[in-house]
Amino acid sequence: MSLLLFAASQVFAADATFTTKSLTPETALKAAQAALAKCRADGFQVAVAVVDRAGLTQVLLRDRFAGAHTPDFAVNKAWTAVSFRTNTTDLEKATRTGQPMAGIRNIPRFASVGGGQMIQAGGSLLGGIGVSGAPGGDNDDVCAAAGIKAIADELELG
């Protein structure tokens, strides 16, 4: 009986911890800077946030003339993408009035407009990037994608 309990405790002990991968602050900053640069090149003043896989802010940048609301909204977009494991453009469609998931729009910090994207590599969620301030979520999405593209070669894909 004691051998059985010992073997069972070994199985549980093996599952008591896990390892995750995270973006370094330098990598998060590079993504944010690239997203900001893309929006600037397109003539948009925005804020960019990069959050870790838990939704905690790693980097927040606001361009000179970006609106006062943009930093918080950029963080919320990144947080939403990470929290729901879905890019915010996809959530916008899935949570429209009359859709089964419409109620989640009432969750504090939930952002149901484009501009929040997951940062993934090798099948793992590493974090999220949110952009706010360009006219329309589609323009925010373009800038967020530029931020991810800027770090793609540095991410571990295996």
Q: Model regions: which residues?
A:
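Flexible, solvent-exposed loop/hinge segments and secondary-structure transition points
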Residues: 13-158
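Bacterial N-terminal signal peptides
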Residues: 1-10
